[in-house]
Amino acid sequence: MQRIHLIMLMILSSQVVRAQSADPQYAIIIKGGHVIDPKNNINELMDVAINKVGKIAAVLKNIDPKTASRVVNAKGLYVTPGIIDMHTHNFAGTEPDNYLRNSYYANQPDGFTFRVGVTTVVDAGSAGWRTFEKFKDQTIDRARTRVLAFLNIVGEGMTGGPPEQNNADMDARLSADMALKYNDLIVGFKVAHYNKPDWVPIDRAIEAGKMAGNIPVIVDFGGSGLSLEELTMKKFRPGDIYTHTYGGGGKEREAITDPLTGKLRPFVFEARQRGVIWDVGHGAASFSFSHAIPATKAGFFPDVISTDHHGGSMNSAMKDILNVMNKFLTLGMEVPAIINSVTWKPAQVIQREQLGNLSVGSEGDVTVLRIRKGKFGVFDQMGQRLEGKQRFECEVTVKGGRVFYDLNGLTNPLPKVVGGLPSL
């Protein structure tokens, strides 16, 4: 009898060993692609493996495809860290006449992210300290996209109109307290749409940033007519962000180019040298080739490429993050620099260095891109059109080791969708 039990135990043990040996080491391998990982200075053919807890496990040549549950065929394609769009508006809701705060003009993220390679968005001030928890419950906690946020220095958030001019609702202490409470989600503070000729919102946002652990401020300079040089050379700390870099012009908002000569203002480079971050924030009417062409000819490309994605920009000259990247490709920005501006650089700016790179242990977010050659047009809100010879297209988007988007079925086996969440 004991002998029978021993034999049965041996059989069961051997079955367990076989099951363990048959269990693949990785959840997914992205195989045969040209990897561009700016943090780690990788720019060559490599394979990327993601483990079963959704973290980067290896970036090596010739990883055995049999060691993964799924394999993405990336031959002829570019493989990058998951794209970070650092300027979006996602506080969608049903309140009328509230612009981008819990209203119709903002967009739920998932329908506009994975299909263009975006795995992380940073909402740029749609909510303030009074409204952030509603935004968290309504959007952040329910999205498949990773949603982080700049908190508006205006407590009510980005309602448009008079509330955004209310100095009494710009409370540095209460804003900082909310950022500290949700320091896993709030990455900085936003100033926007302010039209008075004073520095109140910027001073209070910077104060809040210091109180909340020295996190950055991002500024849409509104229509106050104040000096861009003073903002970037005196007010800003290293790491603070100027958005809508290639927009503006006129008396209400200074541009980075001189209106008389059309040339780049010298202080722009000086501000970069002291640590100021220059963000595209394309938007519906905040990007003009009349500024971008002379700036890029002078060698002034953006630190961060972002969209300012909302209902008014998504079907205009902006469209999506890939289209904005295409504009800078057409303007002569090198591919690795473009990838850096939507991956590792924004991750550093928002102090989330587990994102935007393919280091072992980082989040298993990967974007697979095709660079298609041909004739392609890009244009700005003023109707100026440029023609390019290549453009980015998204083939596959992986977030946390799960395939959330696959344009042409390059994943084998293709994931089944269970309850709206792709299977591992």
Give residue ranges: language-model regions.
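Divalent metal-dependent hydrolysis catalytic cores, especially in the metallo-beta-lactamase
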Residues: Q108-K136, A143-G161, Y182-P197, N214-I218, ...
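Acidic/histidine-rich helix-loop elements
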Residues: N90-N102, E164, K251-E254, S316
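Bacterial Sec-dependent N-terminal signal peptides
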Residues: M1-A22
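Active-site core of metal-dependent hydrolases
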Residues: G188-N315
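Histidine-rich, glycine-flanked metal-binding segment
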Residues: S21-I29, V35-G82
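His/Asp/Glu-enriched, well-ordered alpha-helical/loop segment
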Residues: S290-K373
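C-terminal cap of metal-dependent C-N hydrolases
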Residues: G33, E363-V417
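Metal-associated gating/positioning segment near the N- to mid-region
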Residues: P65-K66, V71-D141
